Amino acid sequence: MHCPFCAAVDTKVIDSRLVGDGSQVRRRRQCLVCNERFTTFEVAELVMPRVIKSDEVREPFNEDKLRRGMLKALEKRPVSSDDVENAINHIKSQLRATGEREVPTKLVGNLVMDALKKLDKVAYIRFASVYRSFEDIREFGEEIARLQD
């Protein structure tokens, strides 16, 4: 690590500690040339898989798109923003855990439906009706019946 004061390359770590939930490491460093001390934070770089759309087009995973879709389904429902963020983080973890470089949108959609089913049944039905392209009332009824089982 370069010293931010004198740009020397030689620095040593004096102290390391986990920060917050343990996903970050705080390090105190000292320059071996000018003896100045400074703090750095390290975070693991987690790469999300690319998404394969139904028309075979591949695009980067878009967390904002995921959030917008979930929030649209959850509109005017009694679900906290913390619960939504936790669900989004869980979905992202599940996608990374596949170990795949690319995942189909079907997998992402199913993970969203699983998360919504746990958060709010009405939001789940809203999302499922669009995601599965319900054509009539019968399909709504069948999905609601599956929820009640």
From Swiss-Prot:
Its cofactor is Zn(2+). Transmembrane segments: none annotated. A zinc finger (unnamed) spans 3-34. Keywords: ATP-binding, DNA-binding, Metal-binding, Nucleotide-binding, Repressor, Transcription, Transcription regulation, Zinc, Zinc-finger. Pfam families: ATP-cone, Zn_ribbon_NrdR. Residues 49-139 form the ATP-cone domain. Signal peptide: none annotated. It comes from the Bacteria. Binds 1 zinc ion. The keyword Cell cycle does not apply. One of its GO terms (biological process) is negative regulation of DNA-templated transcription. GO terms for molecular function: ATP binding; DNA binding; zinc ion binding. The keyword Zinc-finger applies. Belongs to the NrdR family. Negatively regulates transcription of bacterial ribonucleotide reductase nrd genes and operons by binding to NrdR-boxes. This is Transcriptional repressor NrdR.
